[in-house]
Amino acid sequence: MEPAGPAPGRLGPLLCLLLAASCAWSGVAGEEELQVIQPDKSVLVAAGETATLRCTATSLIPVGPIQWFRGAGPGRELIYNQKEGHFPRVTTVSDLTKRNNMDFSIRIGNITPADAGTYYCVKFRKGSPDDVEFKSGAGTELSVRAKPSAPVVSGPAARATPQHTVSFTCESHGFSPRDITLKWFKNGNELSDFQTNVDPVGESVSYSIHSTAKVVLTREDVHSQVICEVAHVTLQGDPLRGTANLSETIRVPPTLEVTQQPVRAENQVNVTCQVRKFYPQRLQLTWLENGNVSRTETASTVTENKDGTYNWMSWLLVNVSAHRDDVKLTCQVEHDGQPAVSKSHDLKVSAHPKEQGSNTAAENTGSNERNIYIVVGVVCTLLVALLMAALYLVRIRQKKAQGSTSSTRLHEPEKNAREITQDTNDITYADLNLPKGKKPAPQAAEPNNHTEYASIQTSPQPASEDTLTYADLDMVHLNRTPKQPAPKPEPSFSEYASVQVPRK
């Protein structure tokens, strides 16, 4: 007898159970086979470029969307949701609308250092009401290779004088990776006294660098520059440079020199104050006379030196006639808001101004009088010479025009020959009559020492008759030629005749 089979009413439920179990086992097998694969462990992208993050799934089961996150844990940031949301910087690599598409890679455009981090591709299973995270990829670390910003160099807040040490700082930000090189230069010469720090110390999406250098100032640093140079892997070509001009940092104090110039006018002395080698140009000068302010002025027209410093000169006219005593002149300079520096000069007043003026006038008058005397003397000398020459000519002409002679008559008086024959020596005499014409008076004060005389000599002769001898004396031949007239008196001279009377 055949065994009885299952009742027809019980066969339906059993088939349903078998089908359900079969479906359950197949679903579990699909879930166990699903894998989310992120093949790239890290991606390095330059700032401004587009980063591609790859992700694939091995199965479409379970049903549910794919989402991208940056970071893990509760604070993770949603980057892309396949199901919903608006993400303008994110695009998918493949067309997710295609059937059986299992490529869930994305692209992120215009990358910035802030985008750096680890990105995760996560598979969700459809649930009600919310989807449930099913499986996540291993993650891809996105590194942004960012260029450093242009270095900014800053100096001290206040100016410093030469021989002082000042500090300069250099800063650059937003670069990645962390490795960076920084150097300092002054006028092309590398500096060694500086310290550099890169922050933060640990991992970060971007970094900053800060460096401080020490520089010793000199008087020639007005045109000098300090340079901060930054080199990074993201830079192509020359490194970045930041500069600072030492002209914004240095202050060169002036040197003063006060000198006295020659007198420009009567009783006025020019005193100059030369302000040399100063920087910057801001300068105020004050003149003091014996401590009292005389004039204040601001440097306007200055002369620039080759080293960038300036020169300026101020002058002061001092009226010495207004001072009885010596004057102390002071040139006081205030430069760039600093305490005033000064230089003094003592102006000597040797005598009372009026006496000095009188002496000067007397000297001028004496000089003029001497000149007048010289001129008058020369003229008088010429006139006297002409007058003497004229007198000489007149006198010569008068003498030639006279034409008369001086006659001398010698008389022998009556004598009683018989009465006086007894006398062996006859007495003979001569009467010398020398007629003279009037001479022109050459000068009132001129003496006329003129002597005319006759000498009679007797000598023994043989006895003979008395002889009467006449002698005519020509005045023309007796007169010597007179010397030329001169201011001195004429020398005296003598005119004489010798008559010899022989005895009989």
UniProtKB/Swiss-Prot annotation:
Record motif SH3-binding, residues: 439-444
A GO term from the CC aspect: cell surface
Gene Ontology biological process: cell adhesion; cell migration; cellular response to hydrogen peroxide; cellular response to interleukin-1; cellular response to interleukin-12; cellular response to type II interferon; monocyte extravasation; negative regulation of canonical NF-kappaB signal transduction
Principal location listed in the UniProt entry: membrane
Extracellular compartment spans: 31-373
Residues of the Ig-like V-type domain: 32-137
Outcome of substituting A486L: Requires 2 nucleotide substitutions
Localization (cell): Membrane
Post-translational modification Phosphotyrosine, affected residues: Y429, Y453, Y470, Y496
Keywords, comma-separated and alphabetical: Disulfide bond, Glycoprotein, Immunoglobulin domain, Membrane, Phosphoprotein, Repeat, SH3-binding, Signal, Transmembrane, Transmembrane helix
Cystine pairs: C55-C121, C170-C228, C273-C331
Signal peptide: 1-30
Tissue: Ubiquitous. Highly expressed in brain. Detected on myeloid cells, but not T-cells. Detected at lower levels in heart, placenta, lung, testis, ovary, colon, liver, small intestine, prostate, spleen, kidney, skeletal muscle and pancreas.
Effect of Q163D: Requires 2 nucleotide substitutions
InterPro entries cross-referenced by the UniProt entry: Ig-like_CS_Receptor, Ig-like_dom, Ig-like_dom_sf, Ig-like_fold, Ig_C1-set, Ig_sub, Ig_V-set
Residue stretches of biased makeup (Polar residues): 446-467
UniProt PTM comment: N-glycosylated.
Protein name: Tyrosine-protein phosphatase non-receptor type substrate 1
